[in-house]
Amino acid sequence: MGNTDFHVTVKKKEVVAAVLPMHHEHWLPMSNLDLLLPPLDFGVFFCYKRSKINNDTKDDDETIKKALAETLVSFYALAGEVVFNSLGEPELLCNNRGVDFFHAYADIELNNLDLYHPDVSVHEKLIPIKKHGVLSVQVTGLKCGGIVVGCTFDHRVADAYSANMFLVAWAAIARKDNNINTVIPSFRRSLLNPRRPPQFDDSFIDSTYVFLSSPPKQPNDVLTSRVYYINSQEINLLQSQATRNGSKRSKLECFSAFLWKTIAEGGIDDSKRCKLGIVVDGRQRLRHDSSTTMKNYFGNVLSVPYTEASVGQLKQTPLGKVADLVHTCLDNVANEHHFPSLIDWVELHRPRQAIVKVYCKDECNDEAAIVVSSGLRFPLSQVNFGWGCPDFGSYIFPWGGQTGYVMPMPSPNKNGDWIVYMHLQKKHLDLVETRAPHIFHPLTACYLDLTATY
């Protein structure tokens, strides 16, 4: 494994505001879908292999910083602050407060970085802690001349789709790529307005979301993050094994079914429940007059349907039937009615804070609760700031609570392999490694070409 015993020195901290300041600050309301998110931050980082020769990290920092100031003109929400209104609901103060920007140095070479254990090698070392604002950025120069760009986003303001839009636009501006039509984000909250009158009649939503009377309890068992490499052949084989009666399931459905079943097989008490949630982006299901309207929408457009079964049931059920359960779960939101109903449901219950039910694991009756979020459209190759595509990149989301979080992403090798970020109880991470070592390979430098050229 790589090295986690290294030091990061912050050389300078700045606040980067939009290069064209706003004439008047204003308040941007959160949509009803934003209001379903508790105060959570998520991180993302990108590793770039560089040579020490002809490499000036200071110039690279300035390039990124200048491009950030330009990008924030369009993505102005990221330069604001989350405040609370008289009802206690969050809203976005667009005041061009700016983004905390850290210049740092780490005394380690990229190929020695322990990517398998991001909790101790990446989180809060190469990805900054966000103390103020909506977004924080850190650019870290490495001993080998490489660079790591890390970002932390306030999830109440942006989902991963929104973050990806920003990252691609930021990189295009940095490399002065005039051949790419930079996306102009849409902050039209009216696109997600509730209907008048609200038309909520979906009992599925009542069973999927719960109200919070107090903040979620701190977990008894601290969850751990690990990153794995999965070969495309194993992914295809899982899909083949889960196909029955000609009903082909998606790779994500088959992977989720396999993970759900594997974790259940480690349970001792067959009566305990095992829950699986799948994050669904609603942009394709909220059609408006313009085909690009929701495509460019910046904010949260997510729902997390979940399904559950007993440990004993999952042990006895063939993988194909487990994949059918996952597919049926997703069918509940794969229609044009779910998201408008969810928006109306939130409106009917405001200002009560609701949260997806699967996030609140029942410690007495649940063996495990896991949420899988697809990062397979992670635009890794497009986050090129001018010195080449990233040699590695991943989202990092240690989101608290006792519900696990899993995100598969494309390998930088562009060969169909996956990088999978997993944030689970240690016993469950050990379990998948023990029961499926042919699938879950701890990520090491040997899977990635991270050695600098001189």
UniProtKB/Swiss-Prot annotation:
Pfam families hit by this protein: Transferase
Free-text disruption phenotype from the record: Suppression of isoeugenol biosynthesis and reduction of several floral volatiles including phenylacetaldehyde, phenylethyl alcohol, phenyl-ethyl acetate, phenylethyl benzoate and benzyl acetate, but increased accumulation of homovanillic acid and coniferyl aldehyde.
MF-aspect GO terms: acetyl-coenzyme A:acetyl alcohol acetyltransferase activity; alcohol O-acyltransferase activity
Gene responsible for this protein: CFAT
Pathway: Aromatic compound metabolism; phenylpropanoid biosynthesis
Record: active site: H155, N384
Protein name per UniProt: Coniferyl alcohol acyltransferase
Species of origin: Petunia hybrida (Petunia)
Keyword Acyltransferase recorded: yes
Subunit structure, as described in the record: Monomer.
